[in-house]
């Protein structure tokens, strides 16, 4: 189990929309091992592979991928956050065949070598302007015949029924603000296929799964994740939140009431897209 004393962040990054003192906690709690394994199997992960986890965060996902490629597989996690890297190394980096590197996936990664399988999950949504360039850069790290797998959300945070009218009006404004101000991409999921197609990948395949699918009594981990999102929104889009009837307090109250209402329905589509690097490229 990860050490709870190390879950809080000691530093911030101006590049990451969701940065907060408790981001390590949020990432650890929200990652569903069973769902992740199902997604990785669809993507084609196999024992013995050399895997790159791009944007590995706290390393929990990297550790699960490491388990799936045994025996004889190895995995490398890369992230730009010193806080996340420190946590990942301490909690997941002590097993044979797993290592973590501080780095920027927008720059050359030749020092890491080539991989049979590259996993890019919940990363491109934070790089709306650079997403296609990141994919093309990662392609250089895929061995000919290897797989690049992109997984991300579409219509992020916007699929709910039946929201109070003020929430219905403000949520799209908040997401639009995040897109423009923080380089986020609310609709990146629908773009993944084109990223692989335009980057010259072959045998491209796409699947659609539910990421959030919340009905009836809400699970503690889902409530925690959404509450943290509200807190971040309040800080990053303060003017918008203050324009809500009743201000932040009413916004938070309305959203919390909606989340705990068992009649509520919330979902977020997850797009999975994989492609093979041709031997000719």
Model-derived segments and spans:
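Conserved alpha-helix/loop element of class I SAM-dependent methyltransferases that forms part
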Residues: 30-49, 64
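A short glycine-rich, Lys/Arg-flanked "PGG" loop and its adjoining helix->strand segment in the class I
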Residues: 132-147
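Helix-to-beta-strand junctions that scaffold the AdoMet/dcAdoMet cofactor pocket
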Residues: 70, 127-128, 142-144
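Conserved catalytic/acceptor-binding region of the Class I
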Residues: 149-218
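A short acidic, Gly/Pro-enriched loop at the edge of an enzyme's catalytic core
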Residues: 109-118
């Amino acid at each position: 189990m990860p050490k709870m004393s190390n879950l809080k962040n000691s530093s911030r990054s101006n590049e990451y929309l969701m940065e907060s003192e408790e981001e390590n906690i949020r990432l650890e709690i929200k990652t569903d091992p069973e769902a992740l394994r199902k997604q990785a199997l669809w993507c084609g992960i196999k024992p013995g592979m050399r895997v790159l986890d791009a944007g590995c965060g706290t390393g929990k996902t990297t550790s699960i991928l490491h388990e799936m490629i045994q025996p004889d597989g190895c995995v490398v996690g890369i992230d730009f956050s010193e806080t996340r890297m420190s946590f990942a190394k301490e909690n997941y980096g002590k097993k044979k065949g797993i290592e973590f590197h501080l780095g920027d996936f927008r720059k050359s990664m030749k020092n890491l070598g080539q991989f049979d399988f590259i996993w890019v999950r919940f990363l491109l949504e934070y790089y709306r302007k650079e997403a296609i360039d990141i994919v093309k850069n990662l392609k250089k790290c895929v061995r000919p015949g290897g797989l690049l797998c992109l997984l991300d959300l579409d219509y992020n945070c916007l699929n709910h029924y039946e929201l109070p009218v003020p929430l219905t009006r403000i949520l799209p404004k908040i997401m639009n603000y995040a897109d423009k101000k923080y380089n986020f991409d609310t609709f990146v999921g629908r773009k993944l296929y084109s990223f692989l197609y335009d980057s010259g990948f072959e045998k491209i395949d796409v699947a659609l799964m539910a990421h959030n699918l919340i009905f009836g009594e809400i699970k503690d981990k889902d409530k925690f994740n959404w509450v943290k999102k509200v807190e971040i929104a309040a800080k990053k889009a303060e003017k918008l939140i203050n324009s809500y009837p009743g201000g932040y307090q009413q916004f938070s109250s309305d959203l919390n009431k909606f989340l705990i209402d068992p009649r509520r329905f919330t979902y977020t589509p997850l797009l999975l897209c994989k492609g093979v690097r041709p031997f000719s490229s």
